[in-house]
Design a protein with these regions (language model features):
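Short, hinge-like loop/turn segments at secondary-structure boundaries
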Residues: 72, 94-99, 168-171
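PRPP-dependent phosphoribosyltransferase catalytic core
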Residues: 2-4, 136-184
Length: 184
């Protein structure tokens, strides 16, 4: 089963995947889709508030944040990692629960990136916002670092995220029943 959608002027067929026995989601993956990544970054930047740095979470937000930073001429964007790396110093972390991840995860931020965010306007970016848990974790990292969240952006808003007045997104992504019909 697939869900056909148009985003940033491009049509894509998204596979419908089970989360559990009663809930299915459309799998939206920008990895490897340069045309879609470039188009979505352009559309989001046209709607973005003024910011100093973009932050995203590993992994699916990386190509989007990279392309947004490239198109905007930003020298750097900030990445919250799923695990600490040997080269990271003064690390701090927050816990996250996501609809696309089976178990609890942590996000880690390097102290050098945290120092860059202090007192700066930070734009939080991800590919899809659904439950908002990943977004909350990114916000907690920004706040812990002393940054000011100036906006929240995603390519797609799924489920309840579609009703968030604080979220800027390109398209709505419905949730699905096991038979592939859209949940009401």
């Amino acid at each position: 089963m697939y869900y056909r959608m148009n985003v940033a002027g491009l049509e894509r067929d998204l596979p419908i995947c089970p989360v559990n026995d009663k809930l299915y989601i459309a799998g939206f993956v920008i990895f490897g889709d340069q045309e879609l990544t470039v188009a979505c970054a352009r559309e989001l930047l046209a709607r973005a508030p003024e910011y100093d740095y973009i932050i995203t979470a590993e992994a699916k937000g990386i190509p989007l944040a990279h392309e947004m930073a490239r198109q905007a001429g930003d020298a750097k964007y900030i990445l919250a990692r799923k695990g600490p790396k040997l080269y990271m110093r003064d690390i701090f972390s927050v816990t996250v629960n996501s609809i696309t991840t089976a178990k609890e995860q942590k996000l880690y931020l390097d102290g050098a990136d945290a120092a860059l965010m202090k007192g700066k306007k930070i734009l939080v970016v991800d590919d899809v916002i659904s439950t908002g848990e990943s977004l909350k974790a990114l916000e907690a990292l920004v706040e812990k670092a002393g940054g000011e969240i100036c906006g929240r952006m995603a390519i797609l808003a799924e489920g309840d995220a579609q009703d968030r007045p604080d979220l800027i997104y390109l398209e709505k992504l419905p949730l699905f029943n096991p038979d592939g019909s859209i949940m009401e």
